[in-house]
């Protein structure tokens, strides 16, 4: 029977990146894992197919070979058949199949397994990220079966597999090639459970919603990860559990924009404040602070408040707060206010206007020069 396309096996596009491949492989492996499907030959075959596909597509060189030549890239004769200048096909098969089934191509001992790592995304408000917070989270996971203490055996007894003799692998000879593959008798575990636990059906693990308390340190930012060692899935047959990785995502804030340990905000001021100068109050993480606005301040001027940013989670130094002034045009004017502004505008005439609005005058001169050059 011809092999299925590796991308089809994992259910991803041919343009899938490393993260998409990893997620697809995890879904596939969880669905067909022998520990979850004891005695199911079809599931075991699908599991091996998933691992083989991921082994090739997750390796840059093998993926390029596969994209160029398909499955033929790993068949006898491709690349010179192991002769000078070409890859040793026995090494290629040993690399692929050995890594897939937990051993080296030379038939080394079965590697110890552990539980899978779990990822969790925690969304925080800026205030929580800056000050730190303790959160209770609930995650679905595979926990050690309490009835058999994770052994999978009702009476706690296991027997050494009489096919692989405890190695979990068998050596298959196909022509001139020797390959390692998981033992069909024990599913790669190296042991046989005579009396499977009725609760976990010999798996040693049960599905469970675990509740944990996670302490988030002050100063974290989007993309930071917190590792909780041993809080991942329980390992099969009493092997060590995996880890839990909590990834932080900080929500957008109504006032502040964060850039590392610095904060940025906009401070609206009136035309009169910008022209005459004033003192305005601004919000900071620690309360209010004052900024002195000098006379003739223009939109876009930055004011720096040292140490009013975020305390770094790594160095414990503090960032700064940058306040950008925005001169706000007044709206909803009363008749008296409109008349005053009209009187004020009437004072700008001729060369006198250039003195009071230098940027506007420079812009007008630039436009005039442009049209003079265009029409000359």
From Swiss-Prot:
Keywords carried by this UniProt record: Chaperone, Cytoplasm, DNA replication, Metal-binding, Repeat, Stress response, Zinc, Zinc-finger
Residues that bind Zn(2+) 2: 161, 164, 183, 186
Gene that specifies this protein: dnaJ
Lineage: Bacteria, Pseudomonadati, Pseudomonadota, Gammaproteobacteria, Lysobacterales
SUPFAM superfamilies associated with the record: Chaperone J-domain, DnaJ/Hsp40 cysteine-rich domain, HSP40/DnaJ peptide-binding domain
UniProt GO molecular function: ATP binding; heat shock protein binding; unfolded protein binding; zinc ion binding
Matches recorded under InterPro entries: DnaJ, DnaJ_C, DnaJ_domain, HSP40/DnaJ_pept-bd, HSP_DnaJ_Cys-rich_dom, HSP_DnaJ_Cys-rich_dom_sf, J_dom_sf
NCBIfam families membership: DnaJ_bact, PRK10767.1
Role of this protein: Participates actively in the response to hyperosmotic and heat shock by preventing the aggregation of stress-denatured proteins and by disaggregating proteins, also in an autonomous, DnaK-independent fashion. Unfolded proteins bind initially to DnaJ; upon interaction with the DnaJ-bound protein, DnaK hydrolyzes its bound ATP, resulting in the formation of a stable complex. GrpE releases ADP from DnaK; ATP binding to DnaK triggers the release of the substrate protein, thus completing the reaction cycle.
Keyword match Metal-binding: yes
Domain notes per entry: The J domain is necessary and sufficient to stimulate DnaK ATPase activity. Zinc center 1 plays an important role in the autonomous, DnaK-independent chaperone activity of DnaJ. Zinc center 2 is essential for interaction with DnaK and for DnaJ activity.
Protein name: Chaperone protein DnaJ
